[in-house]
Design a protein with these regions (language model features):
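A short, structured loop/turn motif at beta-sheet edges
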Residues: 1, 41-46, 71-74, 94
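N-terminal helix-cap/turn-to-beta initiation motif at the start of protein domains
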Residues: 1-7, 24
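Residue-level signal for mature regions of secreted extracellular proteins and peptides
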Residues: 8-9, 48, 86
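Residue-level detector of conserved, well-ordered beta-strand and adjacent loop positions
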Residues: 9, 30, 94
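Beta-sheet ligand-binding and adhesion/scaffold domains
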Residues: 13-14, 52-94
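N-terminal glycine/threonine-rich, aromatic-flanked beta-hairpin/loop signature
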Residues: 14-59
Length: 94
């Protein structure tokens, strides 16, 4: 998990506007209207990491698995949240 820590944006502009949209800290993923508390690691596919998670999105709480896909590109990662099947691409701030 240590290698994922940092600030991220949903656009590949290096967070030039001065504010990151997402931040991954030890045990926490925070973004717009989103706060996920990460728990125990779970089995994941090749190039992926997965964790049990409790995510609050707006006013709803979701329990499930948060998955990080690190295999797509070296300059980005993909993340999927509990209760969703869509992948969100995040780019590190520079």
């Amino acid at each position: 998990m240590e290698h994922l820590l940092g600030k991220y944006a949903t656009t590949d502009d290096g967070c030039r506007e001065g504010t990151a949209e997402f931040e991954i800290r030890r045990g926490i993923v925070e973004g717009p209207n989103l706060l996920c508390i990460l728990g125990a690691p779970k089995e994941a596919g090749p190039g992926q990491e997965a964790y049990e998670a409790k995510c609050t999105q707006k006013s709803q709480v979701h329990l499930g698995t948060i998955t990080f896909d690190l295999s797509a590109k070296p300059d980005s990662l993909k993340i999927t949240l509990p209760e969703t099947a869509d992948w969100l691409t995040l780019y590190p701030c520079k």
